[in-house]
């Protein structure tokens, strides 16, 4: 999502979408013009990107996150889900025994208020409004009518990690997530506060 959205299409290749969150950098009206390296844009051949995922290019990444300093990281190319996990998808994880199959939770260290918990004790805290394992806002182990395609909310990091393992994936590490979701230009000159005022969020 951003102010400028470009789509590149070529027969035999996956469509590539480019987003510019803050076009002031591109249109040269920023008070301190930044310098960018001009490089070719590589597209992925058809059949090389898993369904409902997108390919993120590797290379240098300077996250500039608060408290992290300005560190230069080199990331390898990777895939990330194109859409959020829906209530319906998470319900299938539950129905398939997600909270009962230990391999999805293996090697996790469950901590609450500074104390370690067993997997069994931790699961007792991962419950919905009726005490059944599931997202916090659900009732009797299911989402509300009409909300099957909404993004799932009210789950812990542990549950998200277990779901990712169930799908044969992992949760993206911090810097991989930042590179995919948060343009560096938004850090340098954020435009989100302006857009938020004009958004239709209640």
Question: Could you tell me what each predicted segment is?
Answer:
Residues 56, 121-124, 132-202:
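Functional-site microenvironments in short loops/helix caps that host divalent-cation chemistry
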Residues 2-25, 33-125, 129-130, 135, ...:
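A short glycine-rich, aromatic-capped structural motif
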Residues 28-30, 114, 183-187:
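Short secondary-structure transition/capping segments
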Residues 27, 72-75, 174, 190-191:
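Short, low-complexity, polar/charged sequence segments that are solvent-exposed and flexible
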């Amino acid at each position: 999502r951003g102010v400028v959205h470009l789509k590149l299409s070529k027969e035999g290749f996956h469509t590539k979408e480019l987003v510019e969150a803050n076009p002031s950098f591109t249109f040269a009206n920023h008070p301190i013009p930044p310098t960018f390296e001009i490089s070719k844009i590589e597209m992925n051949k058809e059949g090389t990107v898993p369904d409902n995922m997108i390919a993120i290019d590797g290379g240098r990444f300077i996250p500039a996150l608060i408290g992290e300093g300005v560190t230069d990281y080199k990331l390898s190319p990777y895939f990330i889900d194109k859409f959020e996990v829906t209530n319906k998808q998470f319900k299938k994880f539950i129905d398939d025994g997600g909270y009962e199959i230990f391999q999805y939770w293996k090697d996790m260290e469950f901590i609450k208020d500074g104390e370690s918990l067993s997997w069994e004790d931790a699961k007792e805290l991962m419950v919905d409004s009726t005490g059944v394992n599931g997202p916090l806002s659900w009732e009797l182990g299911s989402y509300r009518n009409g909300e099957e395609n909404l993004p799932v909310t009210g789950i812990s990091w542990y549950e998200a990690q277990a779901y990712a393992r169930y799908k044969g994936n992992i949760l993206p590490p911090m810097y991989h997530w930042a590179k995919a979701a948060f343009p560096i230009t938004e850090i340098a000159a954020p435009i989100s506060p302006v857009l938020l005022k004009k958004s239709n969020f209640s």
